[in-house]
């Protein structure tokens, strides 16, 4: 989960308000109390949540020795890195060896570059700016800076009715768009892209904040390439929204709705990997076709193709593990 911090060591209440309203993850300040009276947010300060020099290090890269010192500090916690003339190569070297590097940046362009270095990017950016628009733009950029996932076409092999069971609707705190949804599966090795309820229907109004994700036992993709059981999710948890082009975004769960409904089983195959998912049997539940458009489960049949993801199977508390695990 990439983060956006703002450096307000030179205190500016108006900029602090902008940063808070933009949803930044933390603020660097000389006195945490200045921020705490405005809103609840992580502070990096001598009296803050994270203490400079103890919980967070700050390093200016000037040569190879300072790079090596930075990597040593990164073993202990986050490191805010400045590169003087803002050159890319030192950051590339650091990002290749640590996932705790935060880049000090002064513009949207610098932030974009830092977030995409070596494709994976830095862990976060620390904005050194007095421009409120830069804060707003970069904060929004970071929220949408999830890595792309490799979606593949699954050819359906089974679509059949089941009995009644408990299914989970994930109501998020975001408005999702057409072509967006969540990756959900019966196993941790393969997922279908389940479309959000953004489509107009004769019988019910759209619920663009909602994904009717499947039965309680299913896995859903969450930030950090982790998974969670649908039944274990709670308000305030983060889940990953995936678009038809593979782009991802982290969103907050506002509510879970678990209700008994008629279910159906959808199974498919991609490159020899089998995927399956138990979903509610209703017109408003949709997977995503290869064209990025929603396909209602009531219209699906064997031979149809939908988007999904193949993953490394085997999970322990949501983390991928290199272990022989058979799920079927």
UniProtKB/Swiss-Prot annotation:
What keywords does the record list, in alphabetical order? Answer: Amino-acid biosynthesis, Aromatic amino acid biosynthesis, NAD, Oxidoreductase
One Gene Ontology term of the biological-process aspect is:
amino acid biosynthetic process
Describe the reaction catalysed, as an equation: 2-amino-2,3,7-trideoxy-D-lyxo-hept-6-ulosonate + NAD(+) + H2O = 3-dehydroquinate + NH4(+) + NADH + H(+)
| EC code | 1.4.1.24
Q: Which InterPro entries match?
A: DHQ_synth (IPR002812)
Return one GO MF term.
NAD binding
Q: What class does this enzyme belong to in the EC scheme? A: oxidoreductase
Q: Which Pfam families match?
A: DHQS
Check the record and name the PANTHER family matching this protein.
Answer: 3-DEHYDROQUINATE SYNTHASE, PTHR33563
Q: Which family does it belong to?
A: Belongs to the archaeal-type DHQ synthase family.
Instruction: Describe its function.
Output: Catalyzes the oxidative deamination and cyclization of 2-amino-3,7-dideoxy-D-threo-hept-6-ulosonic acid (ADH) to yield 3-dehydroquinate (DHQ), which is fed into the canonical shikimic pathway of aromatic amino acid biosynthesis.
The protein's name is 3-dehydroquinate synthase
